[in-house]
Swiss-Prot record:
Pfam families: Ferrochelatase. Signal peptide: none annotated. It is an enzyme of class 4 (lyase). The keyword tRNA processing does not apply. This is Ferrochelatase. Pathway: Porphyrin-containing compound metabolism; protoheme biosynthesis; protoheme from protoporphyrin-IX: step 1/1. It comes from Aliivibrio fischeri (strain MJ11).
């Protein structure tokens, strides 16, 4: 009989503790110091980051955060906490939250599970599509924490779930619900967070996963390539990133006859700055100024029932298939 107690750690990227320049600067500093995210020579990157980028970007980004901040805190944190609560209720086992950068730390999440007697921990990074910049960074944080620990807990880490049937079903359901509320647009654009093209050239499988997710979503919705497509958002710096860029794609859709657009970001498990501000507001402005007539932003899955069911299914499969 297996007497081991299992716990679940949900992991997301992280968020500033407040919509202030100081808090944003601290968060971005930690995030952009990670070599998984920016692998530029440290002697070049660190002076550039601290001398130019952070002093300029932190105040600007803080204002953007202020525009989406919720009563209980950052949207990413609020929705992540709701996911933890819902998954814990569904599984009837301990579930904790950890962020790769900022609070709550991955370390504190694991310690919370250990204090509850968990000797087996399933780590679920909430990144459907694998990337060195996200999922691998979670692994790094865990390895760092246990670098000097003589006995490691029994870990199971979920690699990705880009083609999980319940994930695709949940995405499709969110699109259909939007159609019921707002009417069906001429086109569905799946906008994924971008990464440098160089990372993919060097073996990152992120783009392949994004393409497969889009393909499966199209099949689930019964849409043709004329009715659904994909692009990449949030480019940072001058280096070439995965294309087509969302900002450029939005400029050419209306001239092609697509006047009503539904936009969704399958790579984000929770709404955050990149969806609530960039995708919902900035991208809408680009599309409308380029001749668009109707722009519908479809929220992330957040704590949607099907999304929680998917998480529970992933966790359960790891427990009962041992």
């Amino acid at each position: 009989m297996n007497n081991k107690k299992t716990g679940v750690l949900l992991v997301n990227l992280g968020t500033p503790t407040a919509p202030t320049a100081a808090a944003v600067k601290q968060f971005l500093s930690e995030f952009l110091h990670d070599k998984r995210v920016v692998d530029m020579n440290r002697f070049i990157w660190c002076p550039l980051l601290h001398g130019v980028i952070l002093p300029i970007r932190a105040p600007k980004v803080a204002k953007l955060y202020e525009s989406v901040w919720m009563e209980d805190g950052s949207p990413l944190l609020v929705y992540s906490q709701r996911q933890v609560k819902a998954l814990e209720a569904r599984l009837s086992m301990p579930v904790a939250l950890g962020m790769t950068y900022g609070e709550p730390r991955i370390k504190s999440g694991i310690e919370s599970l250990e204090q509850q007697g968990c000797d087996e921990i399933i780590i679920l990074p909430l990144y459907p599509q694998y990337s060195r910049t996200t999922t691998a960074a979670v692994f790094d944080q865990i390895a760092k924490q246990y670098k000097t620990t003589p006995v490691l807990p029994n870990f199971t880490m979920i690699h990705n779930y880009h083609d999980h049937p319940l994930y695709i079903k949940a995405l499709a359901n969110s699109v259909r619900q939007s159609w019921e509320r707002n009417g069906k647009g001429d086109y569905v654009l799946c906008s994924y967070h971008g990464i440098p093209q160089r990372f993919v050239d060097n073996g990152d499988i992120y783009a392949t996963h994004c393409e497969r997710t889009t393909e499966l979503l199209a099949q689930e919705l019964g849409l043709t390539s004329e009715q659904i497509g994909m692009s990449y958002q949030s480019r940072f710096g001058r280096e070439e990133w995965l294309q087509p860029y969302t900002s450029e794609t939005l400029k050419v859709l209306a001239p092609k006859g697509i006047k009503s657009l539904d936009i969704i970001s399958p790579a984000f498990s929770s709404d955050c700055l990149e969806t609530l501000e960039e995708l919902s507001e900035e991208c809408k402005e680009i599309f409308m100024e380029s001749g668009g007539q109707k722009y519908t932003f479809i929220p992330c899955l957040n704590d949607d029932e099907l999304h929680i069911e998917m998480m529970a299914d992933i966790v359960s499969s790891k427990i009962f298939n041992k």
